[in-house]
Amino acid sequence: MIMNNNPYQVALAAILPRQATNIARHTLASGETVWVRKAGKSIPQWRYTLIGYFAAIFHLNALKPVPNHGDRAVIATKAERLQILEAHGVHVPHLLARSADGIMFTHLGEHTLLECIEHETDDLTRWQQGLDAIRAVHEHGQYLSEPFARNIIACPDGSTGFIDFEEDPGQYMSFTACESRDYLCYLQSTAIILKQRGHLDAAVRLWHAHTRTLSPTVVHDIQAAVRPLLWMRCLHHPRWGKDPLRLAALAELIHLEHRTYA
């Protein structure tokens, strides 16, 4: 339990009134690096209505949006998710202080898995690291929120950490759907990088080996979610923009795996 008189709580109370952005990094008087997430504006409901419409017409159940009510509800959700995940052995930031208007938590590391996959020579090893870390979370009976590679930290001690828990998918979908959603977030954010680096075929082999360790239901849900997007795998020109090309690379990865090993 976080006590009101602990030094982190005092620091949070001092920081919140002067922090201009929703999320910011701070160095405390002790030299410790922390992050503060401040309550911000609610996200317009039309975003969820629009995204939900596309998810519905394509039957993308595992990709359907999770309501984010913004403001204090986000703070409460994030604090709760951090505590639950940490209690189940998932490497997430430790909650140091909380109030209705914000939370303070620890800094896991400087480099995201996205940066590592983009710039390191052994990008496939890093990619596999993300797959294994997501599976470990599920083996603990837990799920993540949006495990895009930018939200996965390559920690200095060699472990893998997760950040960004402002949504709780488990309130709106089954555990199996949460598992599928976690993988889809990760694959969608990384397949295009591996394709650009000429490593998509190798990634297909790794992904197939990984699917052999997963529940058949999860694998089926992932394939079903991507099936309506398979036509996009022929999109290559930059004029399509980053988001469509990410989906195109995801579709190509899943298609190649299914075609090669079905």
Range-by-range predicted roles:
Residues 1-25, 229, 236-239, 243:
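Juxta-kinase regulatory segment immediately upstream of eukaryotic protein kinase catalytic domains
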Residues 22-73:
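ATP-binding glycine-rich loop module of kinase domains
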Residues 41-42, 110, 160, 167-171:
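Activation segment
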Residues 47, 55-59, 68-86, 90-128:
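Conserved structural core of kinase catalytic domains
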Residues 85, 134-137:
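Conserved hydrophobic alpha-helix
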Residues 139-149:
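Catalytic-loop of the protein kinase fold
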Residues 148-155, 161:
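Conserved protein-kinase catalytic-loop segment immediately C-terminal to the catalytic Asp
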Residues 155, 165-262:
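C-lobe/activation-segment region of protein kinase-like
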